[in-house]
Amino acid sequence: MDITILSAKINTLLSVRNKRSLLFVPIFTAVSPTALAQFDLTGSVNADVIEQNIRSEESGVLSLTTLTVTPSVYASYRSKTIRGLWAGTLTHVDRENDTAGQTQNYAEYTYSAQWTPFERLLDFQASGALTYRNTDSTNYLLSDFITNSDSLAKTRSNTLRANVLVEQNNWVNLQGTASYSDVSSESSVTIGDTALDNDSYQINGSVTNGEYARYLIWELDGAYQNTANNNSSDSDFVTRSANGFADIRMSNSWAIRVTARHEANQIEGRLDSATAKREYNSYGAGITYRQNENRYISVTLNQSDSDESENSSESFVGLDLKWALSSRTQINGNYGRRFYGESASASIEYNSKHFRSSLSYGEEVTNTSRLLANPENLGVFVCPVGSTTISNCFQPDSLSYTPSIDEQFVQLSSLNIEFDDSVILQKRTNLQVGYDFSRVIWAFTWLFSENDYLDQNRLQRTLSLGSSLSYQIGSYTSLNSEINFAKIDGQSDDNSLDGSSDNWNALIGLSRTIGNNLETSLSITYLDKSGDLSNGNSLFGSDYTDRRITLSVTYTYQ
């Protein structure tokens, strides 16, 4: 009997202790920010042997054997409130021809971090990169470490950003962003001593009505950006804009709209007519048909007030459209006038299980540093950071998909940018299409951009088309192909930059995975440039053909 009673007491005591110890688990997890933290470190080494044959009018026939070795390191950190990623590569290039050899090294990195102390309220972000970018717009699609490396310039960019979001309130919702970015580059052979060195400060935000608003729907938006040119004290580029509207509801679906807009662009410290401040204001009234916050169309009659005499006191019709056709399809559009005349913006997005597309058209007054610091991304594929093909990518299942820290939306086309930091009016149309089903991953891109150099009286147009295909032949073997084409046209008052260039970049290759860590591939690449558009400093001139055969081996450490 005594033994039985003692045993029962011991079991009761152990049970109490176990319950107490279990209580400490959630308490420790709550007070320790690293309790759920995860740190991952991976790496890879890639080696390429490239046989290259180049034919050009200026250099004749040139045969090269090139060896590249590229080690890469990827480090990521995740916790409840912090996530970050750093990826770095070092590319060693060793070229040999019949008469001489050449060795070069290119170090690159990219990083991103986000701290969210208050979810859906406040977050801080940091991002940046060190890359080698093409500086010769006539060599668009054709410059890399192997060919036209003299057109590359080491470019650094860093951005710090704070975001505030106050939403789903009864009367007022608020969204705001403050950011600082710096962009700098070294010179290249093709651009001479021209280099970027700019700091940008930007604030933008919006205030809208809350959920309780029934008879008055309103919105106010504003933005200010100052880009300081550290190479020149009289070239600070300042822009500001503000616009707002109010819909006074007359019935369940119809409302009277009043609207106003302000815009100003100026290069401070310069008073010449080409760069004087361009200020434009407009106001108007009209009607709105609204079903809900994602389905409305508004038409207004507006009056303008501008520094430009030809655009002052003009009447014009404005359009504002937002219409969700379904949970998979969204259409946005806006039409009106700005200081340069008629202006429009539009976007269409569609997403299904295996097909995703995005089409956008926009106009902005900007320069090279701003384009590099805030790139447009309409990527329809999500890929691991550092991925070079779409074979490892996938289609997100939602229009609002947010990539994880080690993922990124891949922009399959890029803008053709000149590194002179002139103020330009850029109009661009960008189409991205992706398909992912079974063994096939396919992507198509179409990009048209027009750069109007406001203080140089010259124009550049770029039309580019591209297609990428990855076909899984078997469990370990895939066929990859890419073809890209660009037509570049230049016009200038003195005819010094007039001309046209047709650029081709095509690749087909076969890759095979061996085990969990090793991958081999064999590919053929074809590059071609023809036309009469050249800046005069290109190594191979304006007409040349480059053919390559590449054997590649990649080892990945996980």
Q: Language-model segments: what does each one mean?
A:
Residues 1-40, 390-403, 558:
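Cleavable N-terminal export/targeting peptides
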Residues 36-558:
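Gram-negative and organellar
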